[in-house]
Amino acid sequence: MKITKAEVDAVALLARLELTPEETETFTGQMDAILAYVEKLNELDTSGIIPTSHAVPVENAFRDDAVRPSIGVENALANAPDRVEGFFRVPKVIE
C-alpha cells in the first residue's frame, strides 16, 4: 500500500499540523516505510501464538487502604504566602 501526499495532508489536517511541501514529501516516504514494515509483519504465521496484551505476565499489585494521620490544616498552610479562613488564597486566573 502506497501512501499518497493527499493522505499525508489529511492526517496533518486531523492533527492540526501545517506542513511545508518538503515536510509532506518527507512524511510520505516515512509513512510508506512504516506501512511496508507492518505489511511485512502481516506475513508472519501467528496461528499458534496466544494473543497477549503484555509481553510478560504482569498484574496490578494493590495495597490495602489504611487510614493514616494527615498533616493537618495548620501545617499544610504554614508556608502559604496568603491564606484566608483555613484555605489557600491564590491569584485570580480566570476572568
UniProtKB/Swiss-Prot annotation:
Catalysed reactions, as listed in the record: L-glutamyl-tRNA(Gln) + L-glutamine + ATP + H2O = L-glutaminyl-tRNA(Gln) + L-glutamate + ADP + phosphate + H(+); L-aspartyl-tRNA(Asn) + L-glutamine + ATP + H2O = L-asparaginyl-tRNA(Asn) + L-glutamate + ADP + phosphate + 2 H(+)
Q: Please give the Gene Ontology molecular function terms for this protein.
A: asparaginyl-tRNA synthase (glutamine-hydrolyzing) activity; ATP binding; glutaminyl-tRNA synthase (glutamine-hydrolyzing) activity
Task: Tell me if Glycoprotein is a UniProt keyword of this record.
Answer: no
Describe the subunit structure.
Answer: Heterotrimer of A, B and C subunits.
Spell out the HAMAP family in the cross-references: GatC (MF_00122)
| Species in which this protein is naturally found | Geobacter metallireducens (strain ATCC 53774 / DSM 7210 / GS-15)
- What name has this protein been given in UniProt? Aspartyl/glutamyl-tRNA(Asn/Gln) amidotransferase subunit C
The catalytic activity of this protein is classed by the Enzyme Commission as 6.3.5.-
Membrane spanning residue stretches: none
Database matches in InterPro entries: Asp/Glu-ADT_sf_sub_c (IPR036113), GatC (IPR003837)
Ordered alphabetically, the record's keywords are: ATP-binding, Ligase, Nucleotide-binding, Protein biosynthesis
* Gene3D superfamilies, alphabetized: Glu-tRNAGln amidotransferase C subunit, N-terminal domain (1.10.20.60)
Q: Which family does it belong to?
A: Belongs to the GatC family.
Q: What does this protein do?
A: Allows the formation of correctly charged Asn-tRNA(Asn) or Gln-tRNA(Gln) through the transamidation of misacylated Asp-tRNA(Asn) or Glu-tRNA(Gln) in organisms which lack either or both of asparaginyl-tRNA or glutaminyl-tRNA synthetases. The reaction takes place in the presence of glutamine and ATP through an activated phospho-Asp-tRNA(Asn) or phospho-Glu-tRNA(Gln).
A single GO BP: translation
